[in-house]
Amino acid sequence: MEDDRATACVRVDGAPAEATLGGGELRWRRAAGERALSLEREVLGVQARGKEVVVRAFVAAGAARVTSCAAAGAGAGGKGAGRRRCRRDFVLEMADGEGAAVEWAERLTRCLGSFGRPKRLFIFVNPFGGKKCAKKIYDAEIKPLFDAAGVSVTVQETEYQGHAREVASSLDFAKYDGIVCVSGDGVLVEVVNGILQRTDWEEAIKMPIGVVPAGTGNGMAKSLLHSANETCSISNSIFAIIKGHKQSLDVCTLSQGEKKFFSVLLMTWGLVADIDIESEKYRWMGSARFDFYVCTELFPFLSSSFFLAVLSSIISAVIRIMNLRKYFG
């Protein structure tokens, strides 16, 4: 991170204070105690407004990171990590006027820019997933956070199944720093399949993909937020995206004849669906048709062959994930 240290006399909530910038933190000290914000872990963006510097933050609910010398370390990475967060603006009134406010805003912006955060995002919003409220969630919770962070967005509402895959397969990735899926796990899978079907897939797969839990199944978002030591919520997922938090994932490839499908979460054999469809001719039997079909027609002639390749070193990890109760919480 760029070392852009500075000190200034300010007023916070009407009280005089000394503000310091350095070591990746913004601190201000006054009679009531000291307060600090981690630029990387807690600050969304900064704005100069007259002689004021408005620091847009996303802090652990209930407190800023430091309220007194004894409380130091209770924020990101300390006891506050993993708690729910909330939006809050901190206003520093510069004693030296508007020029100082502009200078400090520029310093803070340079520091934030050194973290490699995304500036341009392409966002898929699935209006049909979950409770069908993804668009409302985007307008009420997601857009305000991106606006506060100064992130430019292009929004695409999906109109039918497979739409996200089609768009991802031809999207001009040079225009964006990442893709965000406001949906459940389905749109994420579509985007991955669209990317891996491109002729330039080896380069395109490097594009970061963010996931916001707004669908029926949100296993991937929960898993990624858990690894980032954050509570699973829409706002926390957006903040992780704004911060540029990344984690590499394995991709599973399923080939059946000339068909190829890619998965990043799970893959199952649709046995139950087969039984439901094929036992339709025994509907007159009621619910007993399922058992009857399995015993008389499926098991006697069941013959399936497949080749499974897996690294032995990850088998134990897979078993742990499958047995993690909170994984699908």
Regions found by a protein language model. Name each.
Residues 1-182, 189, 193:
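ATP/NTP phosphate-donor binding region
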Residues 126, 185, 213-215:
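Active-site glycine-centered loops adjacent to acidic/histidine catalytic or metal-binding residues
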Residues 158-160, 166, 173, 189-329:
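Catalytic core of DAGKc-family lipid kinases
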